[in-house]
Curated annotation (Swiss-Prot):
Gene3D superfamilies, per database record: 1.10.8.60, P-loop containing nucleotide triphosphate hydrolases
Domain of life (superkingdom): Eukaryota
Basic and acidic residues bias: start-end ranges: 75-84, 109-118, 219-236
Pfam families noted in UniProt: DNA_pol3_delta2 (PF13177), DNA_pol3_gamma3 (PF12169), DnaA_N-like_STI (PF23007)
Protein name per its UniProtKB record: Protein STICHEL-like 4
Family: Belongs to the DnaX/STICHEL family.
Binding site for Zn(2+): 403, 412, 415, 418
Residues reported in the UniProt entry to bind ATP: 384-391
GO biological process: DNA replication
Length: 966
């Protein structure tokens, strides 16, 4: 292609076509370089060796085949300019061009000849050469063809051998004008002290290869701008500036040349354009229509203020890329204004002044007074839980120390120091995160500030918990050598991790956990500013879950705000992984009601949500605590529950809750060390209310048939003993009118259809215990084995009577009254609801509201026998309430009540007559004197009346153990 172009140049007599073809030759060389660079980037995309790159660039500059022929000056005009003393300079090749290798270049002898002639005509001082192209008119076509056939091919290695000196000298190929008339010499590959201007690449290391080419700036342009404006204006000889394949490369998008920009200039531009450069217009890249009319390469280095502004089509993309690189790396203030980056609630509402610090009044007051009184220390340590404002307080403290405001409140936020800190440009406030080691010398240099400056250097060391021992040693040395105007602020969560040598020299400020009230107020303020629709109870839950950390509460609120709906308590519970209080109370109600099956089912449903067993146990304990404190509201689903159905809870229910809380706290220890946590949690819930269908009233009972039933505590809800009552909602008994055992027994007797059996059961039998539950069980006690065998013959009638009264099938068990049972039944003479423990026994019995007449008679005489030792001379009847009056006030059927009154009246008359004898007969522990008197008495024997008297009055214990002497 170069041969064809050369022949066409020779045919052109005027030189216009030749100038145009030289532009196309220049474009061909650029395309050639593009292909070579593309191939080399595939092999080694990372430019690792800078020195080799510089040497290649020097060779590229000196390669005559890569020069821009259109930039060559006209021979006649150049001679004329030389005589007029005009100064000229050429373009320089950028040192940051990413070209690694290029193809071979041919240097013809004719080029060398005309190069020597050009050196004679023009004197050049700089490292660069000003190349001249011979006139087209002075060369014939035959001579050109002959010289081309004799061309010598020089490879890159041959050209590199010709280049001597340091490759780092890629100073720039600048052309500096000299005012003196001495001979100007040409230096090849050598440095001249004080003449070269070093060009550095200012682009970031992580930029792309295209940005490397576009960010290089020729520094020597300022010399040309100072001296190039004193001549006459000349027209720029850029020809048409449109390549031959413009229509193809223009519409396919950005090419390599568009991306590389003007810094990849592969030749020497026209030196004629150097004259009158001040009048060269600056092209804009605002519209596509403007860019279509721009020339390919235009030198814009004449204005020193536009150092990075390259005119022409190839430099437009480079300008945009350079601007984008600056905004991304440096972060200009203008880019921050135009681009609105998202800030979290923690960053957006971070404290700016001491008044913004929440819940740290003592710390704020102490630091404010220290600044106002100028009593600032050297070392401060802020310690406390996370999210309490330690780092924020350190930043506010640092701003206040450097604030220029003369008012009392600092920081002001409007002075130069505060504004520079907000922009991230304050060099007197340094924050250092957790690092493995410190650069001792570098950090010490930062602390060395000028004494005449009023600013104080504040070094904030955040998260000191993770600092190593070497860091502490280095910090200790820095503190020893630091000047007075340096303040160190250490931020950590605990003082235990800090060395003692540091802690002993610090002013320590503790940041406690924030109160829920303060956190709720702050969250309400944020919610109102951000227009978040949230319930107050939900805010309370968020604050309670934050554990005194405002930062955690703000992050939780920000997450909830992303849902886009009204924030309620169930939504917060689901978000943070909690179970609703209603579900917890339902589970607790089932566990306390001994509903084993539903308890296990509900527990499995809750655990399927992914909740940890420890967390569930902790929530259950929290709910129990709220119920005991009276702060829980049972307004919802109260009718569906069993244990919590009655409100307010009784004392017995409160005791059960306390026992349940104790059980959960003890089970938590096992739960932490166990691998199967769900099993332990299930066992703990089932222990809250074990199965209590059966009752053992006597732990020392000799009957082995009751050993299979579990012992019970003081809960009488499912068990009724002789003389007790029971509240059973399943049977329809209300709390106010629950039947007693005597009422049940009388109702059973009335339902017996055999008349003789009725009287027999009333005289010989009684209910010993009854259990009403899923499988009701009744135990009947008879006075003798004969009576028991007689009742067994009528067992079917008795079962039907019990089923009619209780409304369900009953398991009936009969037994004979023993001596212990007789003593037990004699102890049931207390008032309603009371319990007592007999001496030498461990039975606890609950007494019914009303007693039968026979029971009252026995209780009356039992009390008299117990008081005999205290006052033996006191009469049994005198000074006490009449038995007839007591029986009249007793509850019961009218027929039995009337009969009991008659018996009581007769009994009182007999007691008045036989008072001394009854005293010794009732209790065998009477004194000897009383027994002697009784032996001398003449008693008329009446066996029948005495037998009836002993049957009704005597306790049975004294007569069975010891008979009185006669």
């Amino acid at each position: 292609m170069s041969r064809v172009a050369s022949s066409r140049v020779l045919k052109d007599s005027n030189g216009d076509i030749g100038e145009h073809l030289r532009n196309h030759i220049h474009l061909t060389n650029c395309i050639h370089l593009k292909n070579h660079m593309h191939n080399n980037n595939k092999q080694s995309p990372v430019l690792t060796d800078r020195s080799l790159l510089m040497r290649d660039l020097v060779v590229l500059q000196r390669s005559r085949s890569l020069r821009d022929p259109s930039a060559s000056p006209n021979l006649k005009e150049d001679h004329q300019d030389s005589r007029e003393g005009r100064r000229r300079s050429g373009l320089r090749l950028s040192g940051s061009s990413p070209i690694v290798s290029f193809g071979t270049s041919k240097v013809t002898p004719s080029d060398e000849k005309f190069d020597r002639s050009s050196r004679k005509s023009y004197r050049v001082e700089e490292v660069n050469e000003v190349y001249s192209v011979p006139s087209v008119k002075s060369v014939s076509k035959d001579r050109i063809n002959k010289k081309v056939n004799e061309a010598i091919v020089k490879t890159l290695s041959d050209q590199l051998n010709e280049v001597g000196g340091d490759s780092d000298d890629l100073v720039s190929c600048n052309v500096r004008p000299r005012g003196d008339g001495c001979r100007r010499r040409k230096f090849r590959g050598t440095r001249r002290a004080g003449r070269a201007v070093n060009v550095r690449d200012n682009a970031a290391g992580n930029e792309s290869e295209m940005s490397i080419a576009s960010n290089s700036v020729p520094r020597g342009e300022k010399y040309e701008g100072e001296e190039g404006g004193g001549g006459r204006d000349r027209e720029q000889n850029m020809s048409c500036g449109i390549p031959f394949n413009w229509s193809r490369i223009h519409h396919r998008g950005k090419t390599f040349l568009d991306i590389a920009g003007r810094s990849l200039s592969c030749g020497i531009s026209d030196s004629k354009g150097r004259k009158g450069e001040a009048g060269t217009p600056m092209f804009s890249d605002s519209s596509s229509s403007d860019r279509e009319a721009l020339p390919l390469l235009v030198d814009s280095a004449d204005n020193e203020e536009w150092v990075h502004d390259y005119s022409g089509e190839l430099g437009i993309f480079a300008d945009n890329l350079l601007k984008n690189g600056k905004d991304s790396v440096i972060g200009k203030k203008s880019s921050r204004k135009n681009t609105r980056w998202h800030q979290s609630f923690t960053q957006k509402y971070a404290p700016r002044t001491f008044r913004d610090l929440l819940g740290q009044n003592l710390v704020v007051q102490a630091l404010s007074n220290a600044i106002a009184k100028r009593r600032v220390g050297l070392l401060y340590v802020f310690h406390g839980p996370n999210g309490t404002g330690k780092t924020s307080c350190a930043r506010v403290f640092a701003r206040a120390l450097n604030c220029h405001s003369t008012e009392q409140s600092k920081p002001c936020g409007v002075c130069s120091s505060c504004v520079s800190y907000d922009d991230g440009k304050n060099r007197y406030i340094r924050e250092m995160g957790p690092v493995k080691s410190f650069d001792f010398e570098n950090l010490l240099d930062k602390t060395n500030i000028r004494q005449q400056q009023k600013q104080q250097l504040v070094l904030i060391f955040d998260d000191c918990d993770t600092m190593s021992t070497d860091c502490w040693n280095t910090l200790s040395k820095i503190v020893d050598r630091a000047p007075r105007r340096v303040v160190f602020v250490l931020v950590c969560s605990s003082l235990d991790v800090l060395p003692h040598i540091i802690v002993s020299r610090c002013q320590k400020f503790f940041f406690p956990k924030l109160k829920d009230v303060d956190i709720i107020d702050s969250l309400q303020l944020i919610a109102s500013k951000e227009e978040i629709d949230i319930d107050k109870d939900a805010l309370k839950l968020v604050a309670s879950r934050s554990d005194g950390s405002l930062r955690d509460a703000e992050m939780t609120l920000e997450q909830l705000s992303l849902l886009g709906t009204r924030i309620s308590v169930p939504l917060v519970q689901e978000m943070v992984g909690l179970i609703s209080d209603e579900k917890l109370v339902d589970l607790l109600d089932l566990a306390l009601s001994a509903d084993t099956v539903n308890t296990v089912k509900n527990l499995r449903i809750i655990m399927e949500t992914g909740l940890e067993p420890l967390a569930l146990m902790s929530q259950l304990a929290t709910v129990i605590t709220d119920i005991l404190a009276g702060s829980y509201d049972f307004t919802k689903d109260q009718c569906k529950r069993k244990f919590f159905r009655r409100q307010p809870l009784s004392k017995e229910d409160m005791e059960k809750l306390k026992q349940a809380l104790k059980t959960l706290s003890e089970s938590e220890k096992q739960l932490r060390v166990s691998n199967d946590k769900l099993t332990w949690l299930t066992a703990a819930l089932l222990q809250l209310a074990p199965d209590k269908q059966y009752l053992l009233p006597h732990s020392s009972s000799a009957d082995a048939s009751f050993n299979h039933t579990p012992l019970t505590d003081s809960d009488p809800s499912n068990h009724v003993v002789a003389g007790t009552r029971r509240d059973d909602s399943k049977q329809g008994f209300s709390c106010k009118n629950r039947p007693s055992v005597e009422d049940i027994w009388l109702a059973v007797i009335e339902n017996v259809r055999v008349n003789g059996l009725r009287e027999f059961l009333y005289k010989e039998g009684k209910i010993f215990s009854i259990s009403i539950g899923s499988a009701p069980m009744v135990q009947l006690m008879f006075n003798s084995p004969i009576a028991k065998s007689t009742a067994e013959n009528f067992e079917e009638h008795i079962l039907k009577a019990f089923e009619a009264v209780l409304g369900s099938p009953v398991t009936l068990e009969m037994r004979t009254e023993s001596k212990k049972d007789l003593g037990f039944s004699s102890l049931q003479g207390l008032s309603n609801g009371e319990r007592f423990r007999e001496s030498g026994r461990s039975e606890i019995v609950e007494v019914a509201d009303s007693e039968s007449p026979m029971t009252r008679v026995r209780r009356k005489h039992l009390e008299a026998s117990q008081n005999q030792n205290q006052n033996q001379n006191q009469s049994i009847v005198r000074g006490k309430v009449s038995l007839a009056q007591v029986i009249k006030q007793a509850e019961g059927n009218s027929w039995s009540k009337h009969k009991a009154v008659e018996i009581a009246n007769k009994l009182e008359q007999e007691n008045l007559k036989l008072e001394p004898r009854s005293r010794s007969l009732i209790c065998w522990k009477a004194s000897r004197s009383t027994r002697r008197k009784l032996s001398r008495l003449k008693v008329r024997t009446r066996k029948l009346r005495l037998h009836s008297l002993l049957k009704l009055v005597s306790c049975g214990k004294c007569l069975s153990t010891r008979s009185p002497p006669r």
